[in-house]
Amino acid sequence: KNAYENVKKYVDKLIKGTTNKGLFITGAYGVGKTYLASCIANEIIKNGKSVIFGTLIQLLEFMRDSYSDSEVSDKDHLNLYSSVDLLVIDDLGKEKPTEWVLEKLFLIVNNRYNNYLPIVITTNYNRNQLRERLCINKNYSIVDSIISRLYEMCGGIEIKDDDHRMSDSLIRESLRNSWYNRSISKITLDVKRLVADKNVTFLF
């Protein structure tokens, strides 16, 4: 069955509240993983839910910047990432992380796991490759904890070349009436406002 059809079914379940599982979207570079994750985010937003969408580095740069802002703490950011209705981390494994990044990623993933909240991940890598990409100095302990949690929380969909070639016509046909089918827009976050209003809908 085509990956796009499976994603549509997944989103329908999220909206109806019949699943709180997350989703791993894997595939080679350029097959449309980010676009598909954007479609998911837009549909969840359309149905009145809050979404954070960004790369891991983007997410944590906002947290790191809070060290110079006395009004917003890294704990505020952590709480946002842990409690938003849907968190989308795009292109996981692209950048080599630091120990600080892995520590924060584990806290976010573990908090969402404990709160029964979904997370969507896009990545070019399979499980073993992602393990190697995230590992620092052959210390696999925290990486294994992160990946184990993610795979326990998430189902998986692989986008192949055939799916990519079919994607334009299939999205127009199957998502025309029910999906908010437009490109996701990147906006600059007013973090102070977001911290004050935990129900705000926003995207990176």
Role assignments for model-derived ranges:
Residues 35-48:
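P-loop NTPase Walker A phosphate-binding motif
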Residues 4, 45-83:
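Short glycine-rich substrate-engagement loop in P-loop NTPases that contacts/grips substrate
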Residues 49-50, 83-86, 115-121:
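Loop/turn-to-beta-strand initiation segments
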